[in-house]
From Swiss-Prot:
Name this polypeptide is given: Thymidylate kinase
One GO cellular component term: cytosol
Catalytic reactions on record: dTMP + ATP = dTDP + ADP
Protein residues bound to ATP: G13, L14, E15, G16, A17, G18, K19, S20
One Gene Ontology molecular-function label: dTMP kinase activity
Top-level taxonomy: Bacteria, Pseudomonadati, Pseudomonadota, Gammaproteobacteria, Alteromonadales
Similarity comment text for this entry: Belongs to the thymidylate kinase family.
Keywords: ATP-binding, Kinase, Nucleotide biosynthesis, Nucleotide-binding, Transferase
Length: 209
């Protein structure tokens, strides 16, 4: 791998799937093989404006509940800012980018979970214009197990408090989209952390960059 062949890699998964530890592993792998740390992003978030939008999406306001359509549009507003002001400039400068979630999350959560796929696809096409990661690692986990893990971290946010069937629909959408796109690799996140990390490293080492 070289800095000149900079790529955009994303880690996806339901709550409690182990994204944080996977991202740390991939970050170290990229730095070791390129000599440079990747630009790390999270969604929603990653720019000052996008972080403010993140708070609107994540924190419930009983006095003004966020409707599903507003949630979708806010997330895409944050993503548009991040892509325009961070991700594309970083790639243009030869820097690898490592993302904690990207467009696949919206397709799964808002498209599958909320049942808003036509809106999600329309806004995705309008804002991203075909821009997508070079590789997405989807950490697949039963939603019940994932939420149990997430609950151990502390208080659940507005998204994490959704009913289990929301996450089941999101998972089904993740798996369907992964089956249709060779750039999305499914990792069994029900394994031990060591096994998950072994599988991730195998994918990274096998890719012809």
């Amino acid at each position: 791998m070289t800095q000149a062949s900079a790529k955009f890699i994303v880690v996806e998964g339901l709550e409690g799937a182990g994204k944080s530890s996977a991202i740390a592993l991939i970050r170290d792998f990229i730095e070791k093989h390129t000599g440079h740390a990747p630009v790390c992003t999270r969604e929603p978030g990653g720019t000052p404006l996008a972080e403010r939008i993140r708070d609107l999406v994540k924190i419930a306001d009983p006095s003004d509940p966020l409707c599903d359509e507003s949630e979708c549009l806010l997330i895409y507003a944050a993503r548009a800012q991040l892509v325009a002001n961070v991700i594309k400039p970083a790639l243009a400068q030869g820097n690898w980018v490592l993302g904690d979630r990207h467009n696949l999350s919206s397709l799964a959560y808002q498209g599958g979970g909320r049942g808003l796929m036509p809106l999600v696809e329309a806004v995705s096409n309008a804002t991203l214009k075909g821009f997508k990661p070079d590789l997405t690692l989807y950490l697949d986990l039963d939603p019940k197990l994932g939420l149990q893990r997430a609950a151990k971290r502390g208080e659940l946010d507005r998204i994490e408090q959704q009913a289990i069937d929301f996450f089941e629909r999101a998972r089904a959408t993740y798996l369907k989209l992964a089956s249709e796109d060779e750039c999305i690799v499914v990792i069994d996140a029900s394994q031990t952390m060591a096994e998950v990390h072994k599988d991730i490293l195998a994918v990274l080492q096998a890719m012809a960059w």
